[in-house]
Regions:
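Cytochrome P450 I-helix active-site segment
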Residues: 50-53, 121-173, 198-199, 229-230, ...
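Conserved cytochrome P450 K-helix/beta-meander segment immediately N-terminal to the heme-binding cysteine loop
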Residues: 205-273
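C-terminal, well-structured subdomains that either form a transmembrane helix-short loop-helix hairpin
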Residues: 92-113, 190-193, 198, 202, ...
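Cytochrome P450 heme-binding "Cys pocket" and the immediately downstream C-terminal segment
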Residues: 123-127, 253, 278-282, 288, ...
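C-terminal helix/juxtamembrane-tail motif
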Residues: 365-387
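Cytochrome P450
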Residues: 12-32, 51, 87, 148-161, ...
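Cytochrome P450 catalytic-domain helical core, especially the substrate-recognition surface
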Residues: 1-39, 138, 371-373
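Conserved cytochrome P450 catalytic core segment spanning the I/J/K helices
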Residues: 26-111, 261-270
Length: 387
């Protein structure tokens, strides 16, 4: 964290707008975090515990809560120095808060954003999601939904397939950094051959490339691009049928996809057993192994929960204002609506595929957004007729 901040400070005087914006963001972030930190320290010292999942409060209490409680209950021990030192330094608390917010919130928000955009571009998939949500929840209000009763149906159905496909196409992190221990070389097996990685070597796992490698994924000729495979296309249906690239059915998961190790977090697979399960290492939106994302199940539940709430009552359509106004759309035939929506789809796909990475993958450049309309179910102009 210190190295990152030092880099920002060293570039603030560069005549580059991005550098100045990064520095300004750091200054604002530091101010907000210091204010929140001071507030949580005061609450911890007073023995206050707020409701909900308070990240900063939990970190602060791990260092200040127990110490202050002991000081109040046993002042003599505190004077003798028997009160332990904080488990985390102030810098550790602020650094961990930064990591948790970026890794645990921005990545999830990006995935929700991309999922909504992909479903707006793929109305047929959106209708399938709505049908599934209706079958599972009906008109039951979200506050009455039960995790244990519904999570497996969501993970193993169309909504889970949409999430998996979105993460395959637009993973939060496109290059996962790894390195070989400095003490010795590391030998790995690649296509049956031993490959030696030198000690201290830095390696980046190319998430985008492995997620689109026809060697590991069921694929067909693309109906969108005309290419011989459709791995650049958003196609959640590929997860619903367990088939290999030669068209034969895959009944069981590949042995190398098994993950029985307990690394302290959710220890299941990244995908549901009811869906297509790629060979281990070919699907890594949450990384893999001992340093894989500990919050992956929480992220999956948050994303699917948001999507289910939205599509229980609403539809999302691409805005076509660039090509036709509302009055013109009302006068269109279905074929004319499909034609104008196709233009919006083509532009939206181009925009999304232009996403870039600054910490995480998102729409940083121009235009930086995909215009959409959120309408109640039954009031759609395009989503009910376009595939």
């Amino acid at each position: 964290m210190t190295e990152i901040m030092a880099s920002l400070i060293s570039t603030v005087h560069l005549p580059v707008q991005g550098a100045r914006q990064a520095y300004e963001s750091w200054v604002n972030w530091t101010q907000y975090m210091n204010e929140l930190f001071a507030q949580k320290v005061e609450e911890a010292r007073e023995g206050k515990h707020g409701e909900g999942m308070d990240i900063m409060g939990s970190l602060v209490r791990s260092s200040y809560g127990e110490k202050e409680a002991l000081r109040k209950s046993s002042p003599g021990r505190a004077e003798k120095g028997e009160v332990g030192k904080p488990k985390l330094s102030d810098s550790d608390i602020l650094g961990n808060a930064f990591v948790m917010i970026v890794a645990g919130h921005e990545t999830t928000a990006n995935s929700i954003h991309f999922s909504l955009m992909e479903l707006a571009m793929s109305p047929r998939a959106q209708r399938a999601v709505q049908k599934e949500v209706q079958a599972i929840f009906g008109d039951e209000p979200p506050e009455n939904w039960e995790y244990d009763a519904n999570i497996n149906n969501l993970l193993g159905g169309m909504l889970g397939a949409v999430l998996n496909e979105q993460l395959r196409l637009m993973p939060p992190v496109i290059a996962i950094p790894k390195h070989v221990t400095k003490s010795q070389d590391q030998v790995i097996i690649l296509d049956g051959k031993k490959v030696t990685l030198p000690a201290g070597a830095h390696i980046a796992l190319d998430t985008i490339a492995v997620h689109r490698n026809p060697r590991y994924w069921p694929t067909q000729p693309s109906k969108i691009t005309g290419r011989e495979h459709d791995l650049d296309d958003f196609k959640p249906e590929r997860w619903l049928v367990k088939i290999t690239s030669d068209g034969t059915q895959q009944i069981d998961s590949a042995p190398e996809s098994e993950d029985e190790e307990d690394f302290g977090g959710f220890t299941g697979h990244d995908t549901s057993a009811q869906l297509f399960r790629p060979v281990r290492g070919s699907y890594i939106p949450f990384s893999d192994g001992a340093r894989s994302c500990l919050g992956r199940r929480l992220a999956q539940v948050k994303i699917m929960g948001v999507l289910a709430v939205i599509f229980q009552k609403y539809s999302i359509e691409l805005a076509v204002d660039e090509w036709a106004n509302d009055d013109e759309v009302m006068m269109m035939t279905n074929d004319e609506k499909k034609a104008v929506y196709k233009k919006a789809q083509e532009k939206a796909r181009k925009t999304l595929r232009g996403a870039t990475t600054i910490l995480t993958l998102k729409l940083h450049g121009q235009p930086g957004f995909v215009p959409v309309r959120v309408v109640r179910k039954g009031e759609e102009r395009f989503a009910n007729i376009v595939d």
